[in-house]
Amino acid sequence: LLGWFHKKDLKNFKTIIFFHGNAGSLENRIHKINHFKDININFLIVAWRGFSENQGKPSEKGLYEDGESSIKWLNKKGIKNENIILYGESLGTGIATHLAQNNNFAGVILESPFTSMIDAAKNVYPYFPINILLKDKYENDKKIRNIKSPILIMHGEKDKIVPFWMGKKLYELANKPKYSYFPKNDNHMMEYNKNLIETLNSFFKSLN
C-alpha cells in the first residue's frame, strides 16, 4: 500500500492513522497533513487498494484488511494500539469504526461519518431496493456501540453528501467519553480552520 509516515517523537507523542474518503487521493489531503505537522503528533496516511497508485479493487472486506495492515505496520515499529488514534474521513469512517471495535486504541476521530452505506445510498437513490442491491454495508450505527475508546465526531450541518443527521445519530449512539464538533456552515469536506484545529488539539490533550 502507498502511504506517508511523518514521525516526530514515537516515544512521547500519539500516532494517527488517517483513513481517507472515497473521492480523490493522498495528494488531495495535503492541506490536512500540513495541519497535522503543526501538532505534536505522528501520523500515517494510507491509500486504499484501487486508490492513488495502489493496485487491486476496493471492497469492504479488502479495505478492512488494508486498515489492519496499517495498524500491524505501526505495531512492528513498536507503536502499541493504546498510542494509536484512528481517524476516518467519510468512507474511511467505516474502516475506523470497524477496526476500533472491542479494542484499546487511544482514540477515534470520525469526520463526516455515515450511519451505514445503505442509509447513505438511500439518501441518493431513495426509490431503489438498496438493501438488496448493495454489497458493501459498512454498518457504523451497529458497530459504534462496541467502541470503548474516547471518540470525537465531526460533521458539518450543511453536508450535502452525507446528511448531518447521520453524524448526530452516531454521536448519540457512541459510548462516553465522547466529543462533538458540528459547525453550522461546513459541507462534506470540512474546513480546517482555527476552530477545528482547536477541537482536535483539545481532543488530543484529553487522551494524555
Show where each model-derived region lies:
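Mobile cap/lid helix-loop segments that gate and shape the active-site cleft of serine hydrolases
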Residues: 106, 113-149
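Primarily recognizes the serine-hydrolase "nucleophile elbow" in alpha/beta-hydrolase
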Residues: 73-77, 81-125
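Catalytic histidine neighborhood in serine/cysteine hydrolases
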Residues: 168-189
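Membrane-embedded segments
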Residues: 1-73, 82, 100
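Short beta-strand/loop motif that positions the catalytic acidic residue
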Residues: 146-148, 153-159
